[in-house]
Amino acid sequence: NGSIMGALYKGLIATGLLSIVGLGVANTLTVGWGEIGTVAGKSITGTNLFVCGLIGLIVTGLIVVITEYYTGTNKRPVNSXAQASVTGHGTNVIQGLAVSLESTALPAIVIVGGIIXTYQLAGLFGTAIAVTAMLGIAGMI
């Protein structure tokens, strides 16, 4: 349909799928899928590390979707700022500030959820794996 966001989403999905395959291959070649050690009495497996990478990719995808919602010209946040412009500068500034404060909540919740989930799975190393997966797909975005 000629939409730039459609092209971005197609590229993001393709990059995500290739990243999942790459994560699986790298995991198989480096640590395998079984237990690789213990941290603080908790067993860490290759599967845990793979899931941490998947969580990183999911967090990146969610942030893209949330960002598109808050910046899309046909979505409520942008339309509310445009509507506030009709009544004057003051209401425009107030509405813009309100939307900007609102727009930071969901990405923060998604990132914190990703950190908690990866830390529970594999400690700080699991969080590092997730962040590396996020950086691996960032080039597409």
From Swiss-Prot:
Subcellular location as annotated: Cell inner membrane
Record keyword Cell inner membrane present: yes
Transmembrane segments: 11-31, 46-66, 121-141
Keyword NAD: no
Cellular compartments per GO CC: plasma membrane
EC number: 7.1.3.1
Predominant cellular place of this UniProt entry's protein: membrane
InterPro entries in the cross-refs: PPase-energised_H-pump
Pfam families: H_PPase
EC category name: translocase
Subunit structure: Homodimer.
Record-given protein name: Pyrophosphate-energized proton pump
Underlying gene: hppA
